[in-house]
């Protein structure tokens, strides 16, 4: 296990592993739906700074090359949606992935294939069956990295990826509901052996310290001594959430997720201004709670035009107002009560609308705490707790409908968000 300050930082780690024991081969990185992963992932995937500062406090230039990484790394993007924002057929996606891997390997390049489990809107690709075929065909010429940063995945799935010699990226801050900026990479033994030789790219000293790497990782000896203690504490909190979640019976996990889905669909149906995105359950082998949909993206019809959906800028404005106490702008007690609530949901994802523009898709998702509970729920019976949670979920959509109906007034005063 190697700890990283975020899922994007772990992307640098995955690329660095492909430079060991030396960087003798040019690299092709294949990313799936980069618009549905972290915004900095495409830059990190080719060895470039993805922000203006780093986990170790270095000031850097965004998109500038990071020292020690090959400058000729090639990026290939495979979209998971068509120009209308609709998920592409799995067969088309997997054919494109297979062709991209084969073309890069034929050109004498080392290939890093990034599987996505899951995207910001709940998409999974490619299938485990394709990953097995690619591993059998290309062997050590192919590195597989699984972006499981959503952590909407059970331990048996993670084990199956590791058995394919895939590096699995995880975080503690999304499904697990731990503090933000807690990433890690799970490295299978065959890949971990690379850490015994060579040297990691020199520029990683801006992102990692020795304490985040196993003591046996000789390739990390050039990193600064010490550790990111804030990262360690954030993971301690996330692991506490994981332990409580793991203790919940599997059938109960599935029951709660199905109840959440029904609550989302009911809340959306109460208003005619929402469009719920159609996404299938994750196509996994076998059943289990992680084969159920837990992320629900929705769009909002624009004020004054039921034929148009909010674009990303307007959706982001609405997202900020959801996180603001807007009660002062309303008159009736009911409206003031709804407007006062702070509603924190998933930030909008920009997807194409088929006409050259984009739609901002907001998201609600089930987290581990919905299933396992948290300290403020102590003393509540499970059904009563869930009824309260589903009531809060319905209120999110009620507040959106209220804000939309007073859009011009809100735009005039623009209440500021306060995250608490």
Where are these regions (language model features)?
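Conserved PLP-enzyme active-site core in the AAT-like
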Residues: 2-7, 14-222
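Buried hydrophobic packing segments
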Residues: 10-18, 234-239, 393-399
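Low-complexity, serine/threonine/proline-enriched polar segments
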Residues: 39, 46-85, 227, 286-288, ...
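Short, flexible/disordered intra-domain loops and linkers
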Residues: 84-88, 245-252, 306-313, 373-388
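Active-site C-terminal subdomain of aminotransferase-like
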Residues: 173-289, 403
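Short beta-strand-to-loop capping motifs
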Residues: 187, 298-302, 366
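Conserved small-domain helix->loop->beta segment predominantly found in fold-type I
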Residues: 244-358
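PLP-dependent enzyme catalytic core of the Aspartate aminotransferase-like
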Residues: 349-420
